[in-house]
């Protein structure tokens, strides 16, 4: 079967890393990128050099209005570059880009993201949570995808992609009565380098490099959409901390069935080695956040960091590269959708 042809709208952090993941995984073909704010020579520079993930281990050049991305042992990608502000005006069909990654962070509703369909795209994958598009987390509920009705879908958030696989394993084996999640989250582009005004909560606008900033996140509640039996049982919040990448979920839950920490470790390791291989990972090493930069997993369970008050009340810890792990799942979701027609 031929690879899915992919277009990327928005060549920011996630857009560029989706392209890196696509090159590395070699399971889809990127044929177009749209970004009205970046010239093609600047795209080459931004893709080649990355302060967090390092220099691209291949070559990137441009020829006219095409980016050429190549890496030894991988398929090369000849990528048409568009510069349209209006998603409906992007001629995705002209390069047979059937699948569009909507990674601007702007067009996150079904109505807004479906504008890509007017230009010839067949499916749109929003790389963010969506208020109304169905959310799919690879390894958790992606098999519920409905090819005949789901033309615009959401890959949920990076935090939901970390939390949901772990919550599924724990709920399937022991049952979750209720739980609270905290994510200690790396800075993102929405934050301010120094104190400035914020459109949401005032403290969101405080300097990202100077502060630990309490923040809201819908990631835990979103798990209830992905795993319906957990709906209303989880909520959470975030602390934004001054690190550039890699975040960590702390999931504190009450269990229906009592479980020792060894019991929990066994089922998580079995899932990581079995049905969730490549999505969920397991480590007993004395790891810290930088150990997971460019890790392609959604969720890496930290066995040594977990604690238990009693067999029904536990705190579980799982790491994630909030940029690269998530971008890998975007590519995986496209690959799965492509097999469903």
Curated annotation (Swiss-Prot):
Residues annotated as binding NAD(+): 13-14, 35, 85, 322
GO molecular function ontology, one term from the record: NADP binding
A GO biological-process term: glucose metabolic process
Gene3D superfamilies: Dihydrodipicolinate Reductase, domain 2, NAD(P)-binding Rossmann-like Domain
Pfam families according to UniProt: Gp_dh_C (PF02800), Gp_dh_N (PF00044)
EC number(s) stated in the UniProt entry for this protein: 1.2.1.12
Protein's cellular compartments: Cytoplasm
Keywords: Cytoplasm, Glycolysis, NAD, Oxidoreductase
CDD domains: GAPDH_I_C (cd18126), GAPDH_I_N (cd05214)
SMART domains noted in UniProt: Gp_dh_N
Metabolic or biological pathway: Carbohydrate degradation; glycolysis; pyruvate from D-glyceraldehyde 3-phosphate: step 1/5
Similarity section: Belongs to the glyceraldehyde-3-phosphate dehydrogenase family.
Other notes: There are four nearly identical glyceraldehyde 3-phosphate dehydrogenases in C.elegans.
UniProt xrefs under PANTHER family: GLYCERALDEHYDE 3-PHOSPHATE DEHYDROGENASE, GLYCERALDEHYDE-3-PHOSPHATE DEHYDROGENASE 1-RELATED
Name the UniProt record assigns to this protein: Glyceraldehyde-3-phosphate dehydrogenase 1
Upper taxonomic lineage: Eukaryota, Metazoa, Ecdysozoa, Nematoda, Chromadorea
